[in-house]
């Protein structure tokens, strides 16, 4: 088992004091060297973090010490390296942005379906199966026969529902996403619009991959994740995709052979969308990243601060040496 534990978590629960929760939670993350981002809002908590086994256990224990979070939903996977660079706790209006007021999964949502029961549900010809994730996520993997809403972000999902779904026609709707949070909020939206039988995959794709054997799986491809791994395979190990650092789209080794691909600057997804000014900025960022890598540092996060301090010290030393040389002359 690899050293770094990657923990995706969320819970819809009313947190009236979410603003006051921020600093103690951030302090706990920093104290335990847990990196990643957690979002806090009145409607709950959401995020993905990473650290050692002990560090993640300490963070979970801290969260569960709050009675409101004692049953927080979380999924774990493992990676050879730390996939995040910083520790962050952000305050938000929503922990996942749907952009529709009065949609509250704490009050109403669909029915959870355990991973072991998911295949039976989506094999039912009466079930309308919808992937609530974004276009670029769906491109690299999804469930067999799932509908792709072709959304660029989650805020576009309500429009898809209004234009394509009818509670009188679509009697049985099942939805899924990476970790469960988007599909849970989606079920709240559909219930508010009058849909009756609405289901969502408990724990999301990640929990399904963890619990359902490959030979029985109806998952096809890899699962996009929002960290440096880019995607995970059915064993929840880093998959075959990399990421374009300009547009953040997943890319394959074959994609890197295309003429539009320049490491850190562009790929075939964004080549015609990136301005020359942006390309110049990305090129400088890539240069700094390479320099940092050569010196054994990351170009962002805590290690970047150390590198910046070292560079500052070297410049000061060079100036001091030049000054002394001038004085001697």
Curated annotation (Swiss-Prot):
Active site: 177
Residue ranges occupied by any Rhodanese domain in the UniProt entry: 123-217
UniProt biased composition (Basic and acidic residues): 317-329
Enzyme class: oxidoreductase
Source species, domain of life: Bacteria
UniProt KW keywords: Oxidoreductase, tRNA processing
Pfam family, one: Rhodanese
Segments of this protein annotated with the region Disordered: 310-329
UniProt EC number: 1.14.-.-
One GO BP: tRNA modification
Disulfide cysteine pairs (residue numbers): none
A GO term, aspect molecular function: oxidoreductase activity, acting on paired donors, with incorporation or reduction of molecular oxygen
Catalysed transformations (reactions): uridine(34) in tRNA + AH2 + O2 = 5-hydroxyuridine(34) in tRNA + A + H2O
Physiological role: Catalyzes oxygen-dependent 5-hydroxyuridine (ho5U) modification at position 34 in tRNAs.
PANTHER family: RHODANESE-LIKE DOMAIN-CONTAINING PROTEIN 7-RELATED, THIOSULFATE SULFURTRANSFERASE/RHODANESE-LIKE DOMAIN-CONTAINING PROTEIN 2
Family: Belongs to the TrhO family.
Identification of the protein by name: tRNA uridine(34) hydroxylase
Gene name of this polypeptide: trhO
């Amino acid at each position: 088992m690899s050293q770094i534990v990657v923990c995706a978590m969320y819970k819809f629960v009313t947190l009236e004091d979410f603003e006051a929760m921020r600093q103690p939670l951030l302090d706990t993350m920093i104290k335990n060297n847990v990196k990643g981002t957690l979002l806090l809002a009145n409607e709950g908590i959401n995020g993905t973090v990473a650290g050692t086994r002990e560090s993640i256990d300490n963070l979970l224990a801290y969260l569960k010490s709050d009675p409101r979070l004692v049953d927080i939903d979380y999924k774990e996977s493992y990676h050879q390296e730390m996939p995040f660079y910083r520790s962050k706790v952000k305050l938000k209006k929503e922990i996942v942005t749907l952009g529709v007021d009065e949609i509250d999964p704490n009050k109403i949502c669909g029915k959870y379906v355990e991973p072991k029961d998911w295949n039976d549900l989506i094999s039912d010809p009466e079930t309308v199966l919808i992937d609530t994730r974004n276009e670029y996520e769906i491109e690299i993997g999804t469930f067999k026969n799932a509908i792709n809403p072709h959304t660029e972000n989650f805020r576009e999902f309500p429009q898809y529902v209004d234009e394509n779904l009818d509670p009188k026609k679509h009697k049985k709707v099942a939805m899924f996403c990476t970790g469960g949070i988007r599909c849970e909020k989606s079920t709240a939206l559909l219930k508010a619009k009058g849909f009756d039988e609405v289901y969502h995959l408990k724990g999301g794709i990640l929990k399904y991959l963890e619990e359902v054997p490959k030979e029985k799986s109806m998952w096809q491809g890899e699962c996009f994740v929002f960290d440096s791994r880019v995607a995970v395979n059915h064993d929840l190990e880093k998959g075959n995709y990399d990421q374009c650092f300009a547009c953040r789209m997943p890319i394959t080794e074959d994609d890197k052979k295309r003429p539009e691909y320049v490491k850190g600057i562009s790929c075939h997804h964004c080549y015609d969308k990136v301005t020359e000014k942006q390309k110049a900025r990305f090129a400088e960022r890539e240069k700094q990243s390479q320099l940092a890598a050569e010196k054994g540092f990351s170009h962002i996060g805590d290690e970047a601060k150390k590198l910046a301090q070292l560079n500052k010290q070297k410049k000061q030393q060079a100036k001091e040496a030049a000054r002394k040389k001038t004085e001697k002359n």
